Every structure is written in structure tokens, then in C-alpha cells.
A protein has these predicted regions:
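Catalytic, metal-anchored helix/loop core of enzyme active sites in primary metabolism
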Residues: 1-142
Length: 142
């Protein structure tokens, strides 16, 4: 609810490392772009004294329909996360360009995942091909 935890990783020993920051996606995006290096980012810093506590809730799978699909893609593994990501990227772009409605985003992702036959251990060439095929399939239908 405070929107300050941008990512967490749990290790096999049970330890968890989290990236925290102000409710602003610039920091996690910058981290992803420049990893393993760190760059200066101006702006507000997270103030733990003002924050006082961090609370957690179960995710609302009915409101955030993309979350169970992302979890399904992760469990399926192989090339399925590529399909999820490609379908999500293109569907969101189509929504932002007013080519589809908001709820169509979820239909596009679900249908893209349903039709995909998972490649268990894809190499880079296969991942790029799956991404391209997913884009082409969506473009031909929406």
C-alpha cells in the first residue's frame, strides 16, 4: 500500500533482498537500465522516519488480472514469459494509442498465452522469434 518496495528476491536460504524507494518508477527503471552500475538520480529520497511502517496485503487477483497471468507465465517457464511480456507490451501500446479498450489488454495476453506451445529452454534466437511471432499474431487480429 505504501508503494515503496519496487522489487524483492527470495533466496534459497530464505533470505530476502528488496529494493525500496519513493513511489516513483524512475529508480527501478534506471537500475534495470544501468545494472550493475549505479548512477545519480536527483529527487526525493525515501524517509524511513516519515514512512514509519510498511504494510502488506494479499494481491487482488480479480482487480489486477495481469498478475495471475504473469504468475502462470512464470510457472510455465521456458518461452512463456516472453509471450506474456510481448503481448503485454503490444496490448498496452495499442491501448495508449486508443486502438483497443483497457480490458482488451487482458484478452490479448490470455489468447497469446493460450495459443503458444512452450519451448522449454529457449536460446536467444528462439526468444526473439517467439517475441516476433507474438507481435505478428496480435497485429493480425487487433
Amino acid at each position: 500500500p505504501q508503494s515503496v518496495i519496487h522489487s524483492m528476491v527470495e533466496f534459497k536460504d530464505g533470505g530476502i533482498i528488496a529494493q525500496l524507494g519513493t513511489p516513483d518508477m524512475r529508480l527501478p527503471i534506471q537500475y534495470a537500465l544501468y545494472y550493475p552500475h549505479r548512477r545519480y538520480l536527483g529527487g526525493e529520497r525515501l524517509d524511513f522516519a516519515a514512512l514509519r511502517q510498511i504494510t502488506f496485503e494479499e494481491p487482488d487477483m480479480e482487480t489486477f488480472l495481469g498478475l495471475p497471468m504473469a504468475m502462470q507465465a512464470s510457472r510455465a517457464g521456458g518461452s512463456m514469459p516472453t509471450v506474456f511480456n510481448a503481448a503485454n507490451e503490444l496490448a498496452v501500446s495499442k491501448f495508449l494509442h486508443q486502438e483497443i479498450g483497457f480490458l482488451d489488454i487482458y484478452d490479448i495476453i490470455a489468447q497469446s498465452m493460450e495459443r503458444h506451445k512452450v519451448i522449454e529452454n529457449p536460446n536467444l534466437e528462439e526468444i526473439l522469434a517467439v517475441e516476433s511471432e507474438t507481435y505478428q499474431w496480435i497485429e493480425s487480429r487487433w
